[in-house]
């Protein structure tokens, strides 16, 4: 039986053709002697056309569901069912892990207008637009249609040189607040949720949170609350709008928001192989959800489809270690699916997860080949990952070096699903080809493409379709995923085995996002 299954392994990873997937022959540490022979013959089962077929299927699902595959929508449910069905057919044990989360969408653009003393209409940040208006609707704001008098709450005008405003951070800031008024609150030293909750408790009919005013803190606030539950409209605004509304006293405004903010059920898709040591789990993941505003084919259909293609090829191959693939939900709302998984994994099971590999946005059209900086050799941002992360980084470096492909590092900045694993000391790594960041001239010289332009100009937009994919980046990175899966699936000494965990970099969850409005890839 094992011999027959080993023959099936010959069909795993592609030859290097125009859209085939190169497999760099990186031998597993102390692997089964037969593995190198298996690796050298792994052809036909993992090809870029197969990955593209999955991407087209995800696009079709989005097309049939209002252009989105966001967590909590029928588009995501159908995506999860599609992945699960493919995995079961390939021989995996599949679990749909349910969890509840806060769903939010802005159904139409909001209104903010000054009625008196000087009539004026402010420009909204349109739903799904990357162009900032004068104000925005905060994620998890309630719907509402309010006309009321603006009442300033403990503002610091002019602002201090360094951020210091505590406006709205204490219930006592609202002493003397007139019920039904619109609370005008300044960004500062506490979470937006705290400000909004205090305003709600004081009887405010709506809240406007404007930027604090220091250099770098003047643009429109793009913020989020911790979840559904604040039952009044909550807007973020620029410092200029805040100054405008703060004086004179008695200014009257009209606010209208049209949102859906509620708790919904979604699922992670978890697939375990039937082979390998259950005490040595090699975990590979990608988030499956898109943003509400688009189909999410690069972000992150690319990582999801690449992982799925590799998993299909590996399903009936008896590996030395247990392989576990995961497709996370609600990553776009703050890594919620992966965080739920890690938080609810019993300690004895968590200790069996020996490493985690994350693949988020692996086919950006203006790509750079980025490897997560496990050893902090780039000396930027967050510190090194847990012990073993450096070895993972070196494996991917060797893969690209073998193919004579340039590569560079990318920081563990907490924007994707490795965050919860790093936080608990699990060695982590992965690949990334860039999001809304701007490609440098040095990167353009290495990878081609256009310097001065985003890696993905359709990031978090409706144009993130199957046309928004680099076939070359998709092929190279899928080959890297397949290589890592085989290497770690058969390795007898996994990265970081027996070593103490390094200090974990700070992950970006809703608590930290509240201060700057940033979430994830």
Give the positions of each predicted feature.
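Secretory targeting and sorting signals
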Residues: 1-31
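Noncatalytic luminal/extracellular "stalk/propeptide" segments of secretory-pathway proteins
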Residues: 31, 37, 44, 56, ...
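Second-shell loop/turn segments in exported
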Residues: 37-46, 64-75, 184-190, 195-196, ...
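Catalytic-core environment of secreted peptidases
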Residues: 48-67, 73, 84-90, 162-163, ...
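Soluble metallo-hydrolase cores and metallopeptidase-like ectodomains found primarily
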Residues: 137-168, 224-297, 309-312, 316, ...
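Metal-dependent peptidase/peptidase-like ectodomains
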Residues: 279, 292, 318, 328-435, ...
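His/Asp/Glu-rich mid-to-C-terminal helical/loop segments that flank catalytic regions of hydrolases
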Residues: 438-506
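Acidic, Ser/Thr-rich low-complexity intrinsically disordered segments
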Residues: 502-521
């Amino acid at each position: 039986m094992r011999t027959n299954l080993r023959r099936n392994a010959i069909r795993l990873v592609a030859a290097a053709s125009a859209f085939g997937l190169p497999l760099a022959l990186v031998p597993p540490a102390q692997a089964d002697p037969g593995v190198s022979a298996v690796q050298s013959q792994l052809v036909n089962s993992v090809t870029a056309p197969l990955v593209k077929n999955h991407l087209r299927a995800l696009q079709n699902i989005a097309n049939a569901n209002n252009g989105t595959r966001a967590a909590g929508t029928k588009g995501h449910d159908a995506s999860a069912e599609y992945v699960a069905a493919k995995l079961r057919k390939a021989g995996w044990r599949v679990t749909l892990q349910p969890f509840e989360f806060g769903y939010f969408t802005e159904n139409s653009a909001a209104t903010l207008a000054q009625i008196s003393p000087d009539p004026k209409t402010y420009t909204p940040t349109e739903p799904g637009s990357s162009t900032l208006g004068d104000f925005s609707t905060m994620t998890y704001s309630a719907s509402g249609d309010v006309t009321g008098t603006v009442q300033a709450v403990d503002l610091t005008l002019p602002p201090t040189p360094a951020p210091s405003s505590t406006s709205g951070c204490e219930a006592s800031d609202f002493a003397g607040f007139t019920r039904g008024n619109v609370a005008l609150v300044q960004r500062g030293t506490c979470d937006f949720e705290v400000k909004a909750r205090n305003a709600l408790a004081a009887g405010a009919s709506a809240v406007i949170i404007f930027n604090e005013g220091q250099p770098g803190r003047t643009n429109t606030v793009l913020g989020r609350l911790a979840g559904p539950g604040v039952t009044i409209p909550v807007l973020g605004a620029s410092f200029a709008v805040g100054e405008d509304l703060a004086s004179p006293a008695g200014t009257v405004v009209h606010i209208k928001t049209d949102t859906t903010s509620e708790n919904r059920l979604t699922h992670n898709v978890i697939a375990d192989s039937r082979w390998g040591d259950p005490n040595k789990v090699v975990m590979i993941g990608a988030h499956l959800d898109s943003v509400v505003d688009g189909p999410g084919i690069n972000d992150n259909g690319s990582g999801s489809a690449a992982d799925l293609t590799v998993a299909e090829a590996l399903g009936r191959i008896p590996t030395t270690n247990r392989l576990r693939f995961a497709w996370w939900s609600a990553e776009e709302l703050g890594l919620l699916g992966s965080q739920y998984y890690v938080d609810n994994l019993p300690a004895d099971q968590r200790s069996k997860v020996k490493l985690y590999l994350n693949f988020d946005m692996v086919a950006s059209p203006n790509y750079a080949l980025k490897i997560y900086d496990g050893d902090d050799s780039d000396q930027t941002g967050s510190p090194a990952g847990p012990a073993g992360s450096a070895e993972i980084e070196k494996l991917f470096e060797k893969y690209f070096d073998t193919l004579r492909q340039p590569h560079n590092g990318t920081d563990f900045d907490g924007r994707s699903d490795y965050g919860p694993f790093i936080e608990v000391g699990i060695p982590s790594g992965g690949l990334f080809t860039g999001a809304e960041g701007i490609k440098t001239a040095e990167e353009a010289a290495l990878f081609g493409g256009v310097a001065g332009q985003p890696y993905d100009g359709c990031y978090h937009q409706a144009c993130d379709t199957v046309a928004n994919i680099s076939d070359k980046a998709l092929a190279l990175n899928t080959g890297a995923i397949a290589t890592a899966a085989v290497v770690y699936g058969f390795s007898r000494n996994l990265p970081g085995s027996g070593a103490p965990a390094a200090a974990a970099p700070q992950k970006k969850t809703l608590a930290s996002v509240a201060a700057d409005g940033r979430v994830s890839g």
